[in-house]
């Protein structure tokens, strides 16, 4: 099962990148990679998606364009969008 606290902890190092752009830190990309590892099953993906969405909604100044580029910048094939508006049931 996915624990949102774990997802939150993984994303915290990404907040400066998500709000300002530039290049994500190694710690941020490690967190993105760990979320991918956690989300092994379709249900886990949905749960992780909801955690990511909830985390994104706690930071109103996250830039959506930057957030969507995060997996690419980290070179992680993440099937979960980093967005405040994702329909997690559609994943």
From Swiss-Prot:
Protein name as it appears in the record: Non-specific lipid-transfer protein 1
Organism annotation: Foeniculum vulgare
GO biological process: lipid transport
Family from the record: Belongs to the plant LTP family.
Keywords carried by this UniProt record: Disulfide bond, Lipid-binding, Transport
Domain of life, source organism: Eukaryota
Protein's UniProt keywords contain Coiled coil: no
Gene3D superfamilies for the chain: Plant lipid-transfer and hydrophobic proteins
């Amino acid at each position: 099962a996915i624990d949102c606290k774990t997802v939150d902890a993984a994303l915290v190092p990404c907040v400066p990148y998500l709000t300002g752009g530039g290049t994500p830190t190694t710690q941020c990309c490690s967190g993105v990679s760990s979320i991918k590892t956690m989300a092994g099953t379709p249900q886990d993906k949905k749960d992780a998606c909801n955690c990511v969405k909830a985390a994104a909604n706690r930071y109103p100044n996250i830039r959506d364009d930057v957030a969507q580029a995060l997996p690419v910048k980290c070179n992680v094939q993440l099937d979960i969008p980093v967005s405040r508006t994702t329909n997690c049931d559609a994943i």
